[in-house]
Amino acid sequence: MPSTRNIETHNDSNPTLRALSLSALGIVYGDIGTSPLYTFKTVILLAGGGTPDVTTIMGSASLIIWTLIIIASVKYICFALRIDNDGEGGILALMSLLSLKLKQKPFIIAVGLMGAALIYGDGTITPAISVLSAVEGLEILSPSLKYYVLPIAITILITLFAIQSKGTATIGKAFGPVMAFWFLTIGILGAREVIQHPFVLAAINPVYGLNFLFSNGATGFFILCGVFLCVTGAEALYADLGHFGTAPIRCAWFGLAFPSLIFNYLGQAALVLEGASTEHNIFYMLCPSDFLLPLIILSTVATIIASQAIITGAFSMTRQAMQLGWLPRLRVTQTSSEGYGQIYIGVVNWLLMLATLGLIIGFGSSEKLAAAYGIAVSATMLCTSVLLFIALHKLWKWNIIKSGLVAGLFMIVDASFFAANLTKFINGGYIPITLAIIIYSMMYIWHKGYKTIAIKQKEKNITVDSFLDSIQKEGVVRVPKTAVFLTSKEQDIPPTLVWHVKKNHVLQDKVIILNINNLSIPWCKPGDQLQIVETGAGIWHAVANYGFMEQPHIPKLLKKLETQGYDINIKDITYYIGHETIFVRNVRHTLSKYIKILFVFMHRNALPMSNYFHLPPESVFEIGRQIEI
C-alpha cells in the first residue's frame, strides 16, 4: 500500500522525509512547476502585449505571486492537506468522506463528481500546452525551426502515451531528481535578473496587484485568465496526498518549488522591465544563449514528467470512480509490483491521447491553447472550495462565520478566476467543459442505471430460509465440491444460485454467497477485508470489503479462508456469476428512454465481471438472464 500516512516524517532530519520530498517534486509539482513556460507571457499578452509599462509588469508579477500564496500555499498546503479520507486526498476522496459522514449527500456528490469530471477536461489540455510550450523554445534558437515544433511535440506525446502500458516505474525514479534540478535551474535563472533589478521585489506587495486589477476595468478582469495559469497544477497537491503524506508535500513546496517559482516569475518581470521583447517566450530569454539548447531539452523533459503525472492521475481517479460505482468496469493493469499506484487503463490512455493530439493539431501553438486552458481547472478548484467549506463547518466543527471567512476567501478568489476564464468559452474553453459534461453524464447514467437494477433485484429477493426449505423439499443432491456465487448486497440468495439448483437439481456441499462491498474509504484494514458467517446446510454468507483505492482480487482474498481453518480448497472452487442482458421497455418520455439506452450501451461494453475480479477462466460458470429497465 503506497500511502505514507503512517510514516513518521515530522523530523526534518528523517531520511524518509527527504526521499519522499524529492519524489513529490517529480509527481506532485510537475504541472505547476512548468507553468512559468507560458504564464507570464500570456498575462503580458492579455494586458496588451508590445512594450508594457511598469504598472503592468509589477501588477502582473504581484497577482501571480499572491495567487500562488492564496491558492497553492494557503488553500491547498495549509488547509486541504489536513482534510483527508484515511490518508487519501483529492476531490473524490473528499466527496466520499463528506457523503459518508453527513446528510447532504445529493449536493456533496453532485459537486464532487462535477469537480472530478472537470479534471478530465483539464487533463487533455495540460500535456498539450506543456510539451508544446517547451518545444517552442526551438524558435528562439533558430526561427527556421518553428516548422518542426508541431511534429516534434506530436512525436513526444505519441511516444509518451504508447509506453504507458509498459509502466513507468523504472524511469519514474528519475522524476524527482530531474524536477529538483528543474526547480533549481528556473530559480537561479530568475534570481540572476532579480539581483540585477532588485526593484522588482516590490511586486511582493499585494497593493501593486490590486491597483493593477481594479484600475484597468475589463482588461484587469481578463488578465485573471492568464494569472490563473500559474496554479493550474495546484489540485495535484491535494490529489497526491495518499502517495506521499502531508509533510513531504509541504517540505518540497516551501523548501524548493515555491521559492523557485517566485524567483522565476520575478526574474521574468525584471527582464521585461529591462526592455526585453514580449513577442517571444520570456521564460527562455532568461537563459544565456550558450545554455539555451540544454534548457530547451530540460524544459521538454520537465513537461513530459508533468504530462506523465496527469496521465497517472487520470488512471488513479478512474479506478476510484469505478470502485465507488460511478463508472463501468474497465480493465486495470498493474504495471509494477513496487507501487500500487502504477496502473494502466487502456481506454483512458488512448482517449486522452486522441484528445491531446486533437488539441495540438487544432490550436497549433501554446499561445492559442492558453485560450482553452484554465476554465475546467478553475471550476474544479471552486468545487473543492465548496466542499472545504462543508468540511470546515461540519467536520472541524468551526462555526459558520469562521468557516465562511476562510472558505469564503477561497471561493471568492476561485469564482473570480472561473468567471474570468468563462470569457474563453467561445475561443476554446468549451472543449474541456463539454468533455466534463459528457463524463459527468456518464457517471450519472451509470449510477442511476445500476440503482434501478438494484431496486428490481431487491423486489425479487429470496430469503435464506425459504431457499433452504425449497432444496430440502425437492431433495436436491449435494456433491463434494465448493461453489462461490457472486451477488449484490440487495439479495440474500442470488438468482444464479436459484437457477443452478432449478436446472441441475444438484448443489455443492460447500456454498459461499459472496457480496462485493465497495467502501467510501480508500483502504480496508486487512482484518476487515473478508467477513464470513455460516447460515446452515453448508452455506456461508461472505462479504468482501474493498476501498476505492484497491483492486478486487477474489481468489487471493478467498485463499485466506484456507489459512483460517476452513475446509475449502481454493483450486477446487467453481465461480458462478450472472451475465445480465439489459433491455429497455417502451418508454414514453424521450429523455428517459435515451438515458436508459446509453446505460445499456455502457453495460454491454463494461469489462466482464470474471476479468475484473481476476477469476480463473477455467473455473467460471456464467448464467445468463434478462433484466428489463
UniProtKB/Swiss-Prot annotation:
UniProt KW Cell inner membrane keyword: yes
Keyword terms, alphabetized: Cell inner membrane, Cell membrane, Ion transport, Membrane, Potassium, Potassium transport, Symport, Transmembrane, Transmembrane helix, Transport
Keyword Cytoplasm: no
Compartments reported by the entry: Cell inner membrane
Superkingdom of source: Bacteria
Reactions catalysed, as given in the entry: K(+)(in) + H(+)(in) = K(+)(out) + H(+)(out)
Membrane topology: Multi-pass membrane protein
GO cellular component: plasma membrane
GO molecular function, one term: symporter activity
Regions that span the bilayer: 20-40, 54-74, 106-126, 143-163, 171-191, 212-232, 253-273, 291-311, 343-363, 372-392, 400-420, 425-445
One of the Pfam families matching this protein, by short name: K_trans_C
Main location class: membrane
PANTHER family per UniProt: K+ POTASSIUM TRANSPORTER, OSMOTIC STRESS POTASSIUM TRANSPORTER
Family under the similarity heading: Belongs to the HAK/KUP transporter (TC 2.A.72) family.
Cited function: Transport of potassium into the cell. Likely operates as a K(+):H(+) symporter.
UniProt protein name: Probable potassium transport system protein Kup 3
Species, as recorded: Legionella pneumophila (strain Corby)
Phylogenetic classification of the source organism: Bacteria, Pseudomonadati, Pseudomonadota, Gammaproteobacteria, Legionellales
Protein encoded by which gene: kup3
